[in-house]
């Protein structure tokens, strides 16, 4: 596998561990991946619940919690640490400022177009900025806006395909449409980015994400022009993952039929593992219409059947009567819990085997 270079950062293994909230990827998982030569990513989503003891104010608790997680990751790891901050979060600006102040290596940002992300950088900032997109058009808009308004271009871009877990940047009818597959979109994004690279003489690596599960998958997308990959689902079933054992076991026990598309209160489709809670939602369950968090810009709790941050927090703790686990399309393929070291070693070995010429091709 080739080294992944993002600005002056070099990851020995071109694997980014995707940010997963609420509480699934914190300092434990991120530092473990970074120590193995990949890029570990802390999710900023929902930290106000995990760190509610630090402040009665959800936003303040979340920012204090994020700073604490970044510092813990730094203590545990010598490698590259990133933070995922969704544009849809109401405290997006505060979380970005905290990440930059803590000198995190990279901010990954999706669930909306992060058009003002460079505005938070200061002259002495070292943090790299990496948007997450679902189309060539989206990265073109971001590059043009960033260059025109801030004289800045993305340090890399993540293209997240429709087989990813969690919230999806696609309409529901596009999820099974081959025209929107990762393999179809990736060359388009690589070509779009190349125009800005050539015009402004800046390298912008494209990272492929969504449904990448094996070393063979990594080889396939890198042959299509990706400089690296982002994996989330594969890292959930690791000993270092910050989720509860019950959360991890929900992946191990899942069958292919259990992976389903849901309508999130955020207003986007999402991919999750079937649970009793989701059955209640489909049956018309209505929860109290009071929201103490206001954590998502697009979420009007008076029109939604449940609070998503509470549901995801419950799942993080293993309470599936009152929550559910987001998961990628390949979550059902998981058979056991292993260490991050074992997982990355397995991915590398799979990649090496797929890179060997077959007898017939010699």
Language-model regions: role of each:
Residues 16, 164-207, 213-362:
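Conserved active-site-proximal phosphate/metal-binding subdomains
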Residues 1-199:
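Active-site entrance/lid segments in N-terminal catalytic domains of soluble metabolic enzymes
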């Amino acid at each position: 596998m080739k080294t992944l270079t993002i600005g002056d950062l070099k990851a020995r293994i071109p694997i980014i561990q995707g940010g997963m909230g609420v509480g699934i990827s914190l300092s434990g998982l991120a530092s473990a991946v970074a120590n193995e030569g990949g890029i570990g990513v802390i999710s900023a989503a929902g930290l106000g619940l995990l760190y509610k003891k630090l402040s009665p104010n959800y936003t303040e608790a979340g920012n204090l919690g994020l700073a604490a997680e970044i510092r813990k990751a730094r203590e545990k790891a010598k490698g590259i640490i990133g933070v995922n901050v969704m544009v849809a979060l109401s405290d997006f600006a505060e979380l970005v400022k905290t990440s930059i102040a803590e000198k995190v290596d990279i901010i990954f940002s999706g669930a909306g177009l992060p058009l003002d992300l460079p505005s938070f950088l200061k002259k002495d900032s070292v943090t790299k900025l990496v948007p997450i997109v679902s189309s060539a058009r989206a990265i073109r808009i971001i590059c043009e806006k960033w260059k025109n308004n801030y004289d800045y271009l993305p340090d890399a871009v993540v293209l997240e395909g429709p087989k990813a877990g969690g919230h999806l940047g696609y309409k529901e009818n596009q999820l099974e449409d081959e025209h929107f597959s990762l393999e179809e979109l990736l060359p388009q994004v690589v070509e779009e980015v190349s125009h800005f690279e050539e015009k402004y003489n800046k390298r912008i690596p494209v990272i492929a994400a969504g449904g990448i599960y094996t070393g063979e998958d990594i080889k396939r997308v890198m042959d299509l022009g990706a400089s690296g990959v982002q994996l989330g689902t594969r890292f959930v079933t690791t000993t270092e993952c910050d989720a509860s054992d019950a959360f991890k076991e929900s992946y191990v026990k899942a069958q292919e039929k259990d992976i389903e598309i849901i309508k999130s209160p955020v207003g986007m489709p999402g991919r999750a593992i079937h649970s009793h809670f989701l059955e209640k939602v489909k049956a018309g369950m209505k929860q109290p219409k009071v929201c103490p968090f206001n954590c998502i810009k697009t979420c009007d709790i008076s029109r939604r059947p449940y609070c998503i941050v509470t549901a995801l927090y419950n799942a993080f703790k293993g309470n599936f009567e009152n929550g559910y686990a987001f998961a990628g399309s390949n979550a059902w393929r998981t058979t056991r819990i292993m260490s991050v070291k074992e997982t990355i070693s397995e991915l590398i070995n799979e990649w090496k085997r797929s890179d060997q010429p077959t007898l017939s091709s010699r």
